[in-house]
Amino acid sequence: MENDGGIGLVLSGGGAKGAFQAGVWKAMHELGLIDRVRAISGTSVGALNAAAFAAVGDPEEICHFWRTRAEEVATPNLRNLSLDSLRRAAENVLAGKAFPFHGLLDRSVLEGLIRELMPAEWPSDAPEVVATSLECRGGLFGELDSSSYRRKRFRIGEEPDAEKRLQELIASAAIPWGFDPVEIDGRRYVDGGWDEKGGENVPLTPILQDCPNVSTIVVVRSNSAEIEPEPLKAQGSEGKTLIEVRPSATLKGPFNTLSGFVPDADFIRNLPFLAPLADNLDAIDRQLRIWSGTFAFDGGSMSRFVRQGYADGLAALRRLRPKEKLNWDTL
């Protein structure tokens, strides 16, 4: 398909920070950009949002869902926390199975929420949706071996069966230790945002490789420049306008208080016997700040994330407004 001036939307993983993406979607609606979206690529929570944006569309409904229902995702899987489950997990470790532990969260709750939000029939006029995942091919202690994983792209709108579409979305968001791996057609899949295993937490590649009909790519990242200062690697984006939308301030939840207990790395560097630990402390503090927002599945935090996504989305994307929208604003 030839380039028609459309928009490709990229949604990263980030757990509860998916609420930020919902706010950006609301901003895109108010700026008159949604009808230009031709394809959406998402990983993990970004895949769930991609499907909701394409099939549900209504930003108010989606934002309300994030503010009032998404916290249910954090429901623990009590069966997997039992002593018997822990015993079986230890046996699996000794047997060398790829995923010796079951997920700590109840996947059936997430499945129920998606069924509640999503229509049974996929809209024929919806943008293309690509959900990225990692196929786990097993092997001895495969969870520690990057060669045991292979990237997988699910084209959600091309799957006619609603239940299989659901499982493909869950497969993209099956974060290890959080949710059990998802089995589809005899293959097991885990969260596609697991960069350390070859995943792509900012799934730009599917848009660049498979969507020639877009001239503008909007990339919504979950982490602020304070945490993730590295610029986006966008090889192959020549000739396209690439716009990043990221939090202007770090998305923090209650867990953020723990980062304050990490000693200052610069202070540690001045102590010869502890200096080698300094870089590790920086990494630990950074990871705690990332997790702070990722696991902030409480209504207050997610409402803040929605508001921040809306504000940051308006600021970053205002220049993409159609000219007729600009004219109305100046009346």
Show where each model-derived region lies.
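Long, contiguous secondary-structure blocks with strong helical propensity
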Residues: 47-51
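Gly/Ala-rich beta-loop-alpha elbow adjacent to hydrolase catalytic centers
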Residues: 42, 46
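Patatin-like phospholipase
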Residues: 1-41, 52-331
